[in-house]
Amino acid sequence: MTLSLNDIKRVAKLARIEISETDAQQNLVRLSGIFDLIEQMRAVDTQGIKPMSHSQDMVQRLREDIVTESDQRTLFQSVAPQIEDGYYLVPKVIE
């Protein structure tokens, strides 16, 4: 895909970004490089290659889904300045 200076200016205008001529030229060079890289990646033959979600083919060891800590809400709320119905009461900060 080829990109022109007018394309850069048009996108900047649509995004309501003020862009100088120098910045437009620099962005043109950078974006053209990105598009060239994308074209190179699209040209790679991937037929017969199995898609993968991770670079290392290994199984992650997971722990059992069991409760390991007890409920300490009563202990924590015993030192709170104010609580009501199990909730912490805090000063109002937004009017």
UniProtKB/Swiss-Prot annotation:
Single annotated GO MF: asparaginyl-tRNA synthase (glutamine-hydrolyzing) activity
Coiled coil: none
Keywords: ATP-binding, Ligase, Nucleotide-binding, Protein biosynthesis
Annotated catalysed reactions: L-glutamyl-tRNA(Gln) + L-glutamine + ATP + H2O = L-glutaminyl-tRNA(Gln) + L-glutamate + ADP + phosphate + H(+); L-aspartyl-tRNA(Asn) + L-glutamine + ATP + H2O = L-asparaginyl-tRNA(Asn) + L-glutamate + ADP + phosphate + 2 H(+)
Enzyme class: ligase
InterPro entries: Asp/Glu-ADT_sf_sub_c (IPR036113), GatC (IPR003837)
NCBIfam families named among the record's database cross-references: gatC
Record's protein name: Aspartyl/glutamyl-tRNA(Asn/Gln) amidotransferase subunit C
UniProt source species: Nitrosomonas europaea (strain ATCC 19718 / CIP 103999 / KCTC 2705 / NBRC 14298)
